[in-house]
Amino acid sequence: MEEIKVNVELREKAGVKGVLSAIRAEKKVPAVIYGGQKEPISVSITEKDLKAILKAGSNSVVTLSTPAGKETAIIKEVQYHVVKDTPNHVDFQRISLKEKIDVVVPLKLTGESADVKIYGALINQVLREVAIRALPTAIPHEIAVDISALTIHKAIHISDLSLSKDIEVLGDPERAIVHLMVPREEETVAAPADTAVQPESSSTKGKKDEDGALAKDKK
């Protein structure tokens, strides 16, 4: 995994609303560096550098250069503005390149199942990320899940993932990731034809009887 290097600035009066607003007005994002049995450090990072880290992919290893020294970290959380959807705050977690860490990695479907083309089967991805344990440099940005051989009524489970031996998957190995569903056909039931014989009304029957009687008298 490529290591990213950026400069961050120390910030004072952490958490003060006016200070945070001033930082954001300068196209910077407030952040904190924590973990590693050290005291947290309040810093700020430019929006440009943060976007570069996020573009590189989740769980990217970042070297943060501060006036107090260098910190090796990964992004643990990004908070976004509820309206503008812009980064509002970033949490960086200190890491050691020699120690395994637990992270969550996205699952990306690849390939195309023949049953989707032939039968119109629907793809139902029930698990979109998985927790793993690995050295920071061995952590993938995403894990590919090939559905080319997937058929109807079958599923791909966590245990079916093809991963490096350096990566340990956490959680239930039998948990399903994706399966194919048969589309439910709408059955159209035709309404039965109205073939029942309608009973004659009393007035009609009386008229027929009267006509019959008159015909006999004429004879």
Curated annotation (Swiss-Prot):
Signal sequence annotation: none
Entries under CDD domains matching the protein: Ribosomal_L25_TL5_CTC
Which GO molecular function entries does the Swiss-Prot or TrEMBL record give?
Answer: 5S rRNA binding; structural constituent of ribosome
Q: Which region ranges are annotated with the description Disordered? A: 188-219
GO cellular component terms attached to this protein's record = cytosolic large ribosomal subunit
Which terms are listed as keywords in the entry? Ribonucleoprotein, Ribosomal protein, RNA-binding, rRNA-binding
Under the heading Pfam families, the entry gives: Ribosomal_L25p, Ribosomal_TL5_C
Q: Which GO terms describe its biological process?
A: translation
| Record flagged with keyword rRNA-binding | yes
Q: Where is the composition biased (Basic and acidic residues)?
A: 206-219
Q: How does it assemble?
A: Part of the 50S ribosomal subunit; part of the 5S rRNA/L5/L18/L25 subcomplex. Contacts the 5S rRNA. Binds to the 5S rRNA independently of L5 and L18.
Q: Which family does it belong to?
A: Belongs to the bacterial ribosomal protein bL25 family. CTC subfamily.
- Relate the protein's function as given in its record: This is one of the proteins that binds to the 5S RNA in the ribosome where it forms part of the central protuberance.
Report what the protein is called: Large ribosomal subunit protein bL25
Originating organism:
Elusimicrobium minutum (strain Pei191)
Record gene name? rplY
